[in-house]
Amino acid sequence: MGKYDFTSLPNRLGHHTYKWKEAETDSEVLPAWIADMDFVVLPEIRQAVQTYADQLVYGYTYASEELIKEVQKWEATQHGYHFDKEALVFIEGVVPAISTAIQAFTKEGEAVLINTPVYSPFARSVKLNNRRLITNSLVEKDGLFEIDFDQLEKDLVEEGVKLYILCNPHNPGGRVWEKEVLEKIGQLCQKHGVFLVSDEIHQDLALFGHKHQSFNTINPAFKEFAIVLSSATKTFNIAGTKNSYAVIENPKLRLAYQKRQLANNQHEISGLGYLATEAAYRYGKDWLEELKQVFEDHINYVVDLFGKETKIKVMKPQGTYLIWLDFSAYDLTDEKLQELLRNEAKVILNRGLDFGEEGSLHARLNVAMPKTLLQEVCQRIVTTFSKL
């Protein structure tokens, strides 16, 4: 029994909780989709929020020196990434930060590359900013996603790619990219004059002995064309507080980024976000270690159960609390798959096609919930698909 509570299910109904929205009108459905957790928050974060609530004024705020130091300390101690405070740029979320990077480092009509399947806001951000989307398909090998570097270089060159958005660690596949992989990516970007944005929001959730490598720690030369995005929000389940950060060590890139951020009026951050992030990084190390043990147990449970009881192929993640499920062994269409999950099993998973065309006949399962709830979700899936 650990110090923290990962067995109680907080009441999320009636709180405008996006993940549980459908459950408010259909009491039978269980959500296991959007990437937030159904766990009680770190007590020190709750205390910081309560202290904030006790203030008599909720006005404009700024990033304190204490917050900046906590972010620097966390990145240094957890990931070996040391940087000057001037490199740190706060912004309300990693997805808005990606859009800002697209606007700052490319022009309308220019090509932006992503590795698919991948988190759907990548493609959306490229398209809605009127850039040309280039998709480089990941290859599945030995139960993991890999990058086809020959095809990647071909895409970079032939499509005239200006910006590469990397998901590190990868969502939905849970791949924790090794140093050698990141080195190859950086060399190609350096060779062909491509800017790179590394979305590292899942950085703290490397599991099963794997270690996250921040892109800007791989090679000092890569800092000239790369920026790193991260946040405490995914790790500590505080996405509603709205705070993330970019680390931009090249002063010219940082100036261009901040200019675009100012043009978008994205420079004012929630005081609640600042305080929650500071508390998370100051007090959250032990909580995180327990959380990762919970995730490893939950992932092993899913792998074992589906492996024994179904034809669902499970991509065991090296990190994150998200599992990529392959239903292609069943004779189904994508529409029928969704119908079975939602209407018969009464569970909500992320639709595979939302991550790209490679997601056909796939779904993404979120295991960040008390194990009793996860068991119910998985048993419903087993019951439904054992009939096929």
Locate predicted features:
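Conserved N-terminal alpha-helix of the aminotransferase class I/II PLP-enzyme fold
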Residues: G59-E92
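PLP-dependent class I/II
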Residues: Y4, E24-L30, A35-Q50, F83-D84, ...
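A glycine-/small-polar-enriched, mobile loop at the entrance of the PLP active site in fold-type I
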Residues: P31-D38, Q50-I68
